[in-house]
A protein has these predicted regions:
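N-terminal alpha-helical scaffold/docking segments in eukaryotic complex subunits
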Residues: 1-98, 177-241
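Eukaryote-skewed repeat-based solenoidal scaffolds used as protein-protein interaction platforms
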Residues: 90-209
């Protein structure tokens, strides 16, 4: 696993709040601000749950359109919200607003959210993983998300998200990379891909490549790049098939 980064929740929340104030309407931001204050002061789950679901009635799904300066201000390596929508950003901020001093209660509360989430709500949750307090406590939830049959939810974990590289064990990491190839999404947006490469993953990819070649199907060039450091002879052999 990569070195874990100490995330300052207040710093991240302040940044998200600043973006939403500039990018959304005044009425939307007023509603969100009121909900954030109510959630952080009361610590009531029902307020968080209702606000998390209601965001889409107050913000539209337009991309947040960050400037280069705003992107460079992001203090979390591997986290890139450039393609996020206002709805997703608002939901992330709500998750960060719930009191987190009691780690068990915080995790249990967010587990309830993802347990009842629709696709868009699940995407926002998984995108927020690298920003959450007590991130080590969401490893099983992240591994579960990787097994989803919804590509959009899987991409929320796999792409532009530093959480997998920092917290998933090799088994879950390898499954994520292999699944990315299987569902046909690129590997390049996976943070920490080279650093987390390992011999077990290389062998899994060789087996996968052999199956595809036997069925006269193409093999992604990104696959060979991961196998080459461990099995260069096999790469040369299979590329000639």
């Amino acid at each position: 696993m990569l070195t874990k980064i100490n995330i300052k929740t207040k710093e991240i929340a302040s940044l998200l709040r600043e973006w939403l104030e500039k990018k959304g309407t005044a009425d939307s931001f007023l509603w969100l601000n009121n909900k954030i204050d109510e959630i952080s002061e009361s610590g009531k789950e029902r307020v968080l749950f209702s606000a998390y679901s209601a965001v889409s009635r107050h913000y539209d799904r337009q991309k947040i359109a960050l400037s280069t300066a705003e992107i460079n201000a992001v203090p979390v390596a591997g986290w890139n919200p450039e393609s996020w929508t206002l709805v997703q950003l608002s939901r992330s901020l709500l998750l960060l607003s719930f009191p987190a001093q009691d780690s068990d209660r915080y995790v249990a509360t967010l587990d309830k959210i993802i347990g009842a989430a629709d696709v868009e709500e699940a995407i926002a949750f998984y995108q927020t993983l690298p920003l959450l307090p007590h991130p080590e406590k969401f490893q099983l939830r992240a591994a579960e998300g990787i097994r989803t049959n919804m590509t959009s939810v899987f991409k929320a974990i796999a792409h532009h998200n530093s959480y997998p590289a920092q917290y998933l064990d090799d088994l879950a990491w390898n499954q994520m990379v292999l699944k990315a190839l299987f569902v046909g999404i690129p590997l390049q947006p996976i943070y920490g891909l080279s650093e987390r490469n390992n011999p077990q993953l290389a062998q899994m990819l060789v087996d996968y490549a052999r199956e595809r070649l036997a069925a006269n199907r193409t093999v992604s060039s990104e696959l060979w790049e991961l196998v080459m450091p461990f099995q260069p002879e096999v790469v040369r052999e299979l590329r000639e098939i």
